[in-house]
Amino acid sequence: MKHKTFSLLEKIEKKKIEKETIKIKNIYLHKKKHIKQLKLLSGYQQEYLRKIHDKLILGVSVHQWQNYNSFISVLEVIIQDNINTIKKDEKIIQESFKIWSKNQIQGNIWKHLNMIHKRKILRIKKIKDAIINDSHIQLKFFKKV
């Protein structure tokens, strides 16, 4: 029964490790997507800042300036949201790595205990086989005598 328990616990830890690995991969891809989006949005922001600067030098109506300014403000909010999402993803990745590492250690412990228990069972089986074999030989000897 204990043999099955150690084996079962080892399998559970392996499943936890697989689950955490998939989670890390998905969060990493999510973070990568937001980094790419952040670069794109920052590029747009720089482009519009250059345009408004050039138009301010050449002269721009108040209405156009307000439109550019509103758009740049919206971009800043979206950029900040992306930065916050990237930071949140990074924290989740770090926490997931800690959990993954803990599960790895726990899995190795259960694996080690499982191997020790298997060796112990094998040793007990060999002893029982030797006892049965010795009893069988003694029984044959007594029958001859």
From Swiss-Prot:
UniProt-listed InterPro entries: Flag_assembly_chemotaxis_eff, Flagell_FliJ
Annotated GO CC locations? bacterial-type flagellum; plasma membrane
Q: Which Pfam families match?
A: FliJ
Mode of membrane association: Peripheral membrane protein
Question: Where does this polypeptide localize?
Answer: Cell membrane
Q: Does the keyword GTP-binding apply?
A: no
Give the UniProt record's GO annotations in the biological process aspect.
bacterial-type flagellum organization; bacterial-type flagellum-dependent cell motility; chemotaxis; protein transport
Keyword annotations for this protein? Bacterial flagellum biogenesis, Bacterial flagellum protein export, Cell membrane, Chemotaxis, Membrane, Protein transport, Transport
Family statement: Belongs to the FliJ family.
What function does this protein fulfil?
Flagellar protein that affects chemotactic events.
Provide the protein name.
Answer: Flagellar FliJ protein
Organism encoding this protein: Buchnera aphidicola subsp. Acyrthosiphon pisum (strain APS)
